[in-house]
């Protein structure tokens, strides 16, 4: 088992295997993710990073022929169990994807969409929640006077922050970020990275990134994956300066991948 410090883990992955039909995509993954920290997953394309992320909220169940075996413990409860309400799980474990995906509706309705699925709030309470979520995503000051406008009217960076606001509006405990800045310009990327630092005060964050410099900047822990296996996991500073595995060093230094 790859363990953290004495801090109790928020997520604990136990002997996780994942299959796309007969293809064995994740192999015996064992990992602990600390609360209110940022854990980055790096590795070449196709190594299983995004697949692993999607097991944390069972997003893979939206597609036929995919299955996970093993255990993923969220606060001590196995989220792969048959008795788990997947919709409630996804409220606890929010996700932001590679490309900004605002719903084709107003900024306000983008934020309230998920909240309405899980909570019954008064109009005043909902307005407060919308402002709270947009402030969390550092977007309130930019959109407070145009909440009725389409989310698609925003710039790319603003759209991604809207998606983050939408994810936090349901008050999740974990945020999954799958390449959240790969489609953004450098200035928007810097805004998102700054936001990640702020959000980890309240959320456990797991981020997939192909940008190793980004992983070094934003994460507390880093996992290097290759061909569906977890090669090395540890403190980000250690992974990037004194990795224990030669395969990790080769990838970090650009000799491979």
From Swiss-Prot:
It is a peripheral membrane protein. It is found in: Cell inner membrane. Keywords: ATP-binding, Cell inner membrane, Cell membrane, Membrane, Nucleotide-binding, Phosphate transport, Translocase, Transport. Belongs to the ABC transporter superfamily. Phosphate importer (TC 3.A.1.7) family. The complex is composed of two ATP-binding proteins (PstB), two transmembrane proteins (PstC and PstA) and a solute-binding protein (PstS). It comes from Chromobacterium violaceum (strain ATCC 12472 / DSM 30191 / JCM 1249 / CCUG 213 / NBRC 12614 / NCIMB 9131 / NCTC 9757 / MK). Its EC number is 7.3.2.1. GO terms for molecular function: ATP binding; ATP hydrolysis activity; ATPase-coupled phosphate ion transmembrane transporter activity. Part of the ABC transporter complex PstSACB involved in phosphate import. Responsible for energy coupling to the transport system. Gene3D superfamilies: P-loop containing nucleotide triphosphate hydrolases (3.40.50.300). It catalyses: phosphate(out) + ATP + H2O = ADP + 2 phosphate(in) + H(+). NCBIfam families: 3a0107s01c2. It holds the Pfam family ABC_tran. GO terms for biological process: phosphate ion transmembrane transport. The keyword Membrane applies. PANTHER family: ABC TRANSPORTER I FAMILY MEMBER 17 (PTHR43423), PHOSPHATE IMPORT ATP-BINDING PROTEIN PSTB (PTHR43423:SF3). GO terms for cellular component: plasma membrane. ATP binds at residues 43-50. Residues 11-252 form the ABC transporter domain. This is Phosphate import ATP-binding protein PstB.
